[in-house]
UniProtKB/Swiss-Prot annotation:
This is Lys-gingipain W83. Gene3D superfamilies: 2.60.120.200, 2.60.40.3800, 3.40.50.1460, Gingipain r, domain 1, Immunoglobulins. It comes from Porphyromonas gingivalis. Ca(2+) 3 binds at S988, E990, S1022, G1024, D1146, E1147. Ca(2+) 4 binds at D1001, D1003, D1005, H1007, N1043. One of its GO terms (biological process) is proteolysis. Residues 965-988 are annotated as: Disordered. Keywords: Calcium, Hydrolase, Metal-binding, Protease, Secreted, Signal, Thiol protease, Virulence, Zymogen. It catalyses: Endopeptidase with strict specificity for lysyl bonds. Transmembrane segments: none annotated. Its EC number is 3.4.22.47.
């Protein structure tokens, strides 16, 4: 990836570009830069430009012109005219001095006056992000602008910069432009041809240095050199291993071990040292000297470290002050050559304690090993261009847009690119919690924060991205200043436990706008104009996505620093300079990590079954470019890189000399790692399976393999031909010990002359080719008597000897020997004493009876029978095995045995936990086991085993009853093709209407469904919803809507359930009409015809056309709709209503229905001789003979697979037939597979059939084939069946054959078609089983019940359990869900068994709430030993017996009349509560420390406190409070230890400091329970430790003596239960129609229930009310006028206050929406309006 073209001019702050420009065409057709004839001695280069562009600019110093040339940078002395120049980084050989010779160029002068151009603008210095733009002076050198004649640099310049990792770097600058400021003329030199020669170059030393320092990890840097091709002839680069020098604080030795082990396993050669070593030391100087020596020593040995890891904070490894930055830097630990270029990739794992280091390491190991349970977050990134008035648009936005345009997009695999280019930044950091793989922020920063949008170290500590760790880059000031007095931002984000980042790249000093821009996108000459790939050099974004490179976190930082180096000026350093940036940027965390780019690929690899010892190298197959490492116990033995053919030669730096299991790790950039073990030692004599494959469907894993080639477990017979006359029979040897085999040699006077044979076995298997010749006899002439004993450990017969007699050969009969199973060389001899020759049998056959490395499997008996074959004794080998159970298969998952005793070559496991798993299959023989063969499997989904929900327990007498709900809300890891699909869709509209939804304005009035937010339109218990209007504000008036809101496409093969919340925006204008539809086809209005739900929202009262619409929002109601199978879209339609107000919709959720039950068709209900019941048949050939049911009770020759009935179709039935018969199932929508059994006539087996599916109907033309076959030669039985009396001759039935066929999605019907055959006999079908997809049925898991820790019942499928005869006393009952893959957490409930009286409630009353149609029930708690000590609802204010303390002394305290309005906020289920403020409207932020203290209490035995608390504004909710108890006094000093302390949960992120607080949704009321200690006298509620939120509300404080309540209340209306689990002694039943109601309240105890107490109530209608506004609001043109007897404020929709005042406020608006807030007599009014 190379970038050459650089674009136009720079515009620094204080410079604004006009759209006034001119282009001067030059004397070259194109802009072009080339490097040719590249060698160690020289290279040629050419530079040509096709145009100069002039742009008029306005600056603080006046009007100037900016000049730019494609591919050039702006240069010049600060304050002098700025001209463009070209800059290239070049490699310079060792010892060389680069000399430039200009071969030719053209030159032309251009008068800028002819183009109406001003003088060229003065060159400006770089601007730090810490600078105040208003205080930065505009630099103008008057003397420079008075010079006459052309001024400028020499045409070419070269400057040596330093040495970077073995390559000397220089900057080559071309200055094509000179300028005469007085004459206002440009001199342009073009078509420049130069030669750069390297005088004094030492080619040998250059190559030696490059070879010694080379590592593929530095290719990112090498690729940025102009003449980089000089090194393309380098040797075998990929044999260069990765080396890392680690210097760590001594206290980290133990914590560092897991990381060191992993890095060694990954293939890093580690050199680890600690600061307690004398040669390392503890000072900066000693550590630096030690590191430099290590690097130089390594360089001399061609083993220079690639990475330098510093472990610890500055207390153990200090940094040093930068020469340029004057801030802490680690640069000089790795800049060994004395310049500012480092030689090693350096990173610091900064930790102050071993625990913090463990936090960093745990994240790194999970990320690098890819063990995170959900990898989908890797496809998401967060990109933020932070706030800055000028530079956000000039630098921030172009930077982020560049990243999105070229890399972070769908083309590169990213599903979600959360980008925030400018304010508002609402909710931007919430994505860190839900999961992103990369977060990049560019703008301002501090030591402990990203500045705007603000992300502090405190917020980092509160992140919740467990298992979703990311790389973060902060292009901002000082966030990586790691010697700051407290942990800096970069340290905290990496140190936090189970959250945050695994690495952070950031700057220690202030960073600069221009250089940060170059750092990210590459060097260029443009600010404020979108950069292009072609117009920039390589930046950090580009380096991240380099293919086939080792892209590490460190290399990303290097690429950024090199881009800043590229942009530096030659001779006139007006930028801050490259040296500054190499000192500035650091990697905190692990810089050696290779970040994944979206979803990583899967490596294709093959490992040998075992490795031999003492090898110099091993070959391992892996994806090309993979790095392969072999290690054991954290010690690295060898590494290698897979070549283009996918073969890695792993060179062993430490040879393997011991048997055992060794780790093999395969890594490659953007590939998932392979982490395996491989056995070292002799190959196992037990043959493994072959061709193991694994597939997944949902949480179901299917394994398939082939049996060991030596035999088949199904009992088949295999014959292998070896030669002409040798038969080897292999059978189980049950009479030998484990790991042994028996060899038998048998003969029967083969030649009739009493000559015989010997069997010689060499256990060392090293005699073949030497002692045992490849051809010819074993020996000729007389052999030494020790020939056998010296070479062959085992002989048959046992006394075999080279001196042949009839006693030491096998002539007739057999001999045997028992040997250890394993690999042998062997030969079978045929002695010829007369000639003195020892022949080897079978010499004239196809394969002589001599073998090199033959495997004798343990537990087997090998019988070699000698036979005559023609004129010689050639060889045949027969392998026999008549025992189908001679071995079985064992299956392992993740090292755990999960199934053994298998005989089939397939295995299925359902309900597998989500994540990566390794499945292995092992063959278990009688005497031993084979090596495992393994396969990696990734199962998608969630890992959690869902427990039961809502467990309750009760007792009556000694009978205990438990009830619970089935597991829900989490995927069910259980035997199912597709476990619980969970929620298909969930939308709260907090961020508007998603792009995937569709809206249709069918009436065409321009008003469709819209997103709404407070103020004005509050969602259901949230800030936002969607709405549709039948009356519009702002002068719109009456509307007649026909508006559709349509979901994205859904997948509901079995239907689903829709729930949503709906309300009328104005309770007095509530009669909005709407309907819900489902479509199984498209999402146009015409696709929605039959409503599933249609209704008109109930009005609360009589309306008046003049009422103030929108003041009182109606009640939110939840609706539930069943969706039919196949639903693809759901539509919400607002229509047939007019002149109301708005209908609001929120919290739409759709869940897929559970699967249909699996079912099996046995045909037992069908009648012999008739078509099968509930199936459809088609006789397509019209011969009158289709599918029929047959019964074995009617036909002697027939045997059903199960039961007595089958279905059949004939191709011969007394005469030849040509069948085309369909057997069609009923509707099987949702089926994923069909399993069936078939049989044919064993003598005429060719009846062809097909399995077909239809997604539509049951006509023959609706079906397509998914599987077909022609049965042939089954030959497996038939003897047990009788002879056919119907067929022509004996035609026995075959055995039943099982088949399973996968069905495609959308299958509705399945057909079995019998066709394409004739004159055979029949095909039979039986036991057809359909497996259905979807969520689990109740029997997919079972329940286990425990009492007091003892299991008392398991295998339950119902959600209830009863046990009688339970002993009196307290018992704990628990219920656990048992899945195939694991068990859920237990859910428990306490049950008391006794004869206690179950007391009812007391003093139940029912009354109609004032000015509403609600009923309010109140009662007293049931009589009990517990006494209610205090019960306060603050309805009459704060009682005098309570005490308030304004500890901060600001005059604001707890109150029931909060300013500015003076009216109480709504209480919990009442009108009034008590409140304390951290922000008061019109006053601003508060810093409360306010106490609310109870009256004196008497709780000698302790007690229980319950209260309700909420934030008044859900968007400003983070109020901090605590509860204390005092046993002494009631002053603030008496309350020391908090019993409860917390921050209320915020619903959304605060969007604007000036938002109208309190006018949006009130926060959720939470009930809290606190146990009070014995002797408590006072309880205090303290509001403190927070500022600038809004108000905290407190209500319904109840204190009882003794233990917490042990009962709840159940509420009934007209004998129907309407609520349960109620804990307070009041209940509100809203929105009732007029009429009489009977209410009941029951007390539910843990072990019983009370009688129901009742009360009656008559709800009457409300009187007509016409609300009057205490203000007037008019809009005339664009002028808004508010008149009132109070205060008025006008806001925009971002919450910014635009105007405010008393009595009359006038504001001239732009077009858009506004909110008006009026406060009159302590009451607040808010109205939303639109200005056109």
């Amino acid at each position: 990836m190379r970038k050459l073209l650089l674009l136009i001019a720079a515009s620094l702050l204080g410079v604004g570009l006009y759209a006034q420009s001119a282009k001067i065409k030059l004397d070259a057709p194109t802009t072009r830069t080339t490097c040719t004839n590249n060698s160690f001695k020289q290279f040629d280069a050419s530079f040509s430009f096709n145009e100069v562009e002039l742009t008029k600019v306005e600056t603080k110093g006046g009007t100037f012109a900016s000049v730019s040339i494609p591919g050039a940078f702006p240069t010049g002395e600060v304050g002098s005219p700025e001209v463009p120049a070209v800059r290239k980084l070049i490699a310079v050989p060792v010892g060389a001095t680069p000399v430039v010779r200009v071969k030719s160029f053209t030159e032309q002068v251009y008068s800028l006056n002819q183009y109406g151009s001003e003088k060229l603008m003065p060159h400006q210095p770089s601007m730090s992000k810490s600078d105040d733009p208003e205080k930065v002076p505009f630099v103008y050198n008057a003397a420079a602008y008075a010079r006459k004649g052309f001024v400028g640099q020499e045409l070419t310049q070269v400057e040596m910069l330093g040495t970077m990792r073995g390559v000397r770097i220089a900057a080559l600058t071309i200055n094509p432009v000179q300028y005469d400021v007085v004459a206002n003329q440009l001199k342009v030199r073009n078509n420049i041809e130069i030669e750069v020669s390297f005088q004094g170059a030492d080619e040998v030393a250059t190559q030696r240095l490059y070879d010694a320092s080379f590592s593929p990890y530095f290719e990112t840097a090498y690729k940025q050199l102009f003449n980089r091709d000089v090194y393309t002839d380098h040797g075998d680069l990929y044999n260069t291993p990765v080396r890392m020098l680690v210097v760590a604080g001594a206290k980290f030795k133990e914590a560092l071990k897991p990381w060191l082990t992993w890095k060694a396993q990954k293939g890093f050669y580690l050199d680890v040292h600690y600061t307690d070593e004398a040669e390392v030391g503890t000072t900066n100087a000693s550590i630096k000297a030690f590191i430099h020596k290590k690097y130089n020593d390594g360089l001399a040995a061609s083993a220079a470290p690639v990475f330098l890891a510093l472990v610890g904070d500055t207390d153990v490894i200090s940094g040093e002050k930068g020469k340029k930055t004057k801030k802490v830097t680690d640069l000089y630990y790795s800049a060994v050559d004395g310049d500012y270029f480092p030689e090693m990739y350096t990173f610091r794992m900064s930790a102050s304690s071993p625990e913090e280091l463990t936090n960093i390491i745990d994240k790194v190991l999970m990320y690098e090993k890819a063990t995170m349970p959900d990898k989908s977050y890797l496809e998401k990134v967060l990109l933020i261009a932070g706030a800055d008035y000028s530079w956000n648009s000039q630098v921030g936005q172009p930077t982020i847009k560049y990243g999105m345009q070229y890399y972070y997009n769908q083309e590169h695999g990213y599903t979600d690119v959360y980008n925030y280019l400018k304010a508002p930044y609402t909710g931007c950091y919430s994505h860190l919690n839900t999961g992103v793989s990369f977060a990049n922020y560019t703008a301002h920063g501090s030591e402990t924060a990203w500045a705007d949008p603000l992300l502090t170290t405190s917020q980092l500590k509160a992140l919740t991205n467990k298992d979703k760790y990311f790389l973060a880059i902060g292009n901002c000031c000082i966030t990586a200043q790691f010697d700051y007095v407290q942990p800096c931002f970069g340290e905290v984000i990496t140190r936090v436990k189970e959250k945050g980042a695994y690495a952070y790249i950031g700057s220690s000093p202030n960073s600069y706008w221009g250089e940060d821009y170059y750092w990210s996108v590459g060097a260029n000459a443009v600010f404020g104009v979108q950069p292009t790939f072609e117009g920039t050099s390589m930046g950090s974004y580009d380096a991240t996505f380099l293919e086939d490179s080792y892209n590490t976190v460190n290399s990303i930082m290097w690429a950024g620093n090199l881009a800043a180096t590229h942009a530096g000026n030659i001779g006139n350093i007006t930028h801050i300079g490259a040296h500054y940036y190499w000192e500035a940027y650091h990697v905190l965390g692990d810089g050696s990590v290779m970040p994944y780019r979206a979803m990583p690929k899967t490596n294709t690899y093959t490992l040998p079954a075992s490795l031999p010892q003492n090898q110099a190298s091993y070959s391992i197959q892996a994806s090309a470019g993979s790095y392969v490492a072999i290690s054991k116990d954290g010690v690295l033995y060898g590494t290698g890189v897979a070549n283009a053919s996918g073969v890695a030669t792993v060179s062993m730096t430490k040879q393997i000399t011991e048997n055992g299991n060794y780790d093999v790790v395969i890594t490659r950039s953007n590939y998932l790692p392979v982490i395996k073990q491989i056995q070292v030692g002799e190959p196992s004599p037990y043959q493994p399976v072959s061709n193991l494959t694994a597939t997944t469907q949902g949480q179901k894993v299917t394994l398939k393999w082939e049996a060991p080639s030596a035999k088949k477990a199904e009992g088949s017979r295999e014959v292998k031909r070896i030669g002409d006359g040798l038969f080897v029979t292999i059978e189980p040897a049950n009479d030998v010990r484990a790991n042994e085999a028996k060899v038998v040699l048998a003969a029967d006077n083969v030649w009739g002359d009493n000559t015989g044979y010997q069997f010689l076995l060499d256990a060392d298997h090293n005699t073949f080719g030497s002692v045992i010749p490849a051809t010819g006899p074993l020996f000729t002439g007389t052999a030494s008597s020790n020939l056998y004993s010296a070479n062959f450990e085992y002989l048959v017969p046992a006394n075999a000897d080279p001196v042949v007699t009839t006693q030491n050969i096998i002539v007739t009969g057999q001999g045997e020997v028992v040997i250890p199973g394993g690999v042998y060389d062997y030969c079978i001899t045929n002695p010829e004493p007369a000639s003195g020759k020892m022949w080897i049998a079978g010499d004239g056959g196809n394969q002589p009876a001599r073998y090199d490395d033959f495997t004798f499997e343990a537990g087997k008996k090998y019988t070699f029978t000698m036979r005559r074959a023609g004129m010689g004794d050639g060889t045949d080998m027969e392998v026999e095995d008549d025992s189908p159970a001679s071995y079985t298969y064992t299956v392992y998952r993740d090292g755990t045995k999960i199934k053994e005793g298998l005989t089939a070559t397939t295995f299925e496991e359902d309900g597998v936990a989500a994540g990566n798993h390794e499945y292995c299959v092992e063959v278990k023989y009688t005497a031993g086991v084979s090596p495992k063969v393994c396969k990696d499997v990734t199962v998608e989904g969630s890992n959690e085993f869902a427990p039961v929900q809502n467990l309750t327990g009760s007792s009556v007498g000694q009978k205990v009853t438990l009830k619970w709900d089935a597991p829900n809300g989490t995927p069910n890891p259980n035997p199912n093709p597709n476990p619980n699909p969970g929620t298909t869709l969930s939308e709260s509209f907090e961020n508007g209407i998603p792009a995937s939804w569709k809206t249709i304005d069918a009436d065409g009035d321009g008003h469709g469904w819209k997103p709404g937010n407070a103020p004005g339109i509050a969602g259901y218990n949230s800030n936002g919803c969607v709405y549709s209007e039948s009356f519009g504000l702002g002068g719109i008036g009456v509307l007649t809507p026909d508006n559709y809101l349509i979901t994205p496409a859904l997948d509901l093969p079995n239907g689903g359930k829709l729930t949503f919340w709906v309300c009328a925006q104005d309770a007095n204008y509530a009669s909005e009409h709407y309907a819900v539809y489902a479509s199984s086809t498209g999402n146009d209005a015409s696709n929605f015809t039959n409503a599933l739900l249609e209704e008109t929202i109930t009005a609360k009262g009589v309306r008046s056309p003049k009422a103030i619409r929108g003041r009182i929002q109606g009640t939110w109601r939840q609706k539930t709709v069943d969706l039919p199978a196949g639903t693809k879209y759901v539509a919400f339609r607002h229509f047939q209503s007019t002149d109301m107000f708005y209908i609001d919709l929120d919290e739409v959720e759709i869940k897929a229905n559970g699967k249909r039950a699996d079912f099996t068709e046995t045909f037992e209900s069908s009648t012999h001789g008739e078509a099968p019941a509930e199936w459809t048949t088609i006789d397509a050939d019209g011969d009158g003979q289709g599918w029929l049911c047959l019964s074995s009770g009617q036909l002697d020759w027939l045997t059903a697979h199960g039961g007595s009935n089958v279905v059949s179709s004939f191709s011969w039935n007394g005469m030849a037939l040509n069948p085309d018969n369909y057997l069609i199932s009923k509707d099987v929508t949702g089926a994923t597979k069909v399993k069936y059994y078939y049989a044919v006539n064993d003598g005429f087996p060719g009846d062809h059939y097909a399995v077909m599916i239809s997604k539509t109907g049951t006509n023959a033309g609706d079906f397509t084939v998914v599987f077909e076959e022609t049965p042939n030669g089954i030959n497996k039985g038939g003897a047990r069946f009788g002879l056919s009396t119907e067929a022509n001759g004996a035609k026995p039935q075959s055995v039943w054959i099982e088949r399973t066929v996968d069905l495609p999605a959308g299958t509705k019907y399945v057909a079995f078609r019998h066709y394409n055959c004739s004159d055979l006999n029949y095909i039979l079908l039986d036991d057809i089983q359909f497996t259905m997809g979807g969520s689990p049925t109740p029997t997919d898991y079972t329940y286990t019940v425990y009492r007091d820790g003892t299991k008392i019942k398991e295998g339950l499928t119902e959600t209830t359990f009863e046990e009688d005869g339970v002993a009196t006393g307290n018992h704990e009952y628990c219920v656990e869900v048992k899945y195939t893959a694991g068990v859920s957490p237990k859910k428990c409930v306490d049950v008391t068994v006794n004869s206690t009286q179950f007391n009812p409630v007391q003093n139940l009353t029912a009354e109609q709430a004032p000015n509403s149609m609600d009923a309010i029930l109140k009662w007293n708690a049931p009589a009990s030993k517990r006494a209610e000590v205090l019960n306060e609802d603050f309805e009459n204010g704060i009682p005098a017996s309570w005490k308030t303390i304004d500890a901060d002394g600001d005059g604001n305290n707890w109150t029931t009349t909060p300013p500015p309005g003076g009216s109480s906020f709504a209480g919990h289920n009442s009108a009034i509560c008590v409140s304390s403020a951290s922000h008061i409207n019109f006053e601003g932020p508060q810093n409360p420390d306010n106490y609310l203290v109870t009256p004196e209490l008497s709780l000698p035995g302790g007690g229980t406190l319950t209260f309700w608390v909420c934030a008044q504004d859900a968007n400003y909710a983070s109020e901090h409070y605590a509860v204390y108890a005092s046993s002494t006094g009631n002053d603030a000093s008496n309350f020391a230890n908090a019993l409860l302390e917390e921050v209320l949960t915020a619903k959304t992120v605060v969007t604007a400091p000036e938002a109208i607080r309190g006018t949006r949704a009130q926060g959720t009321w939470y009930q809290k329970t606190v146990q009070l200690p014995a002797g408590t006298k006072y309880v205090a509620f303290r509001h403190f430790g927070c500022t600038d939120f809004f108000w905290i509300n407190l209500d319904d404080v109840v204190i009882t003596s003794g233990n917490a309540p042990s009962y709840t209340y159940t509420i009934y209306r007209n004998n129907t239960q309407i609520a349960s689990g109620v804990t307070e002694t009041t209940y509100r039943d809203p929105d009732l129609a007029t009429g009489f109601y009977t209410y009941g309240v029951k007390v539910v105890y843990p072990n019983g229930e009370s009688a129901i107490e009742t009360a009656t109530l008559n709800i009457t209608s409300l009187a007509d009310v016409t609300a009057q506004k205490p203000y007037t609001l008019t809009v005339v043109g664009k002028t808004i006028t508010v008149t009132c007897q109070g205060e008025a404020m006008i806001y925009d929709m971002n919450g910014r206050r635009l105007a405010a005042g008393r009595n009359t406020v006038v504001y001239t608006a732009q077009g858009g929406h506004y909110a008006v807030m009026v406060v009159v007599d302590g009451k607040s009014y808010v109205e939303k309006l639109a200005v056109k």
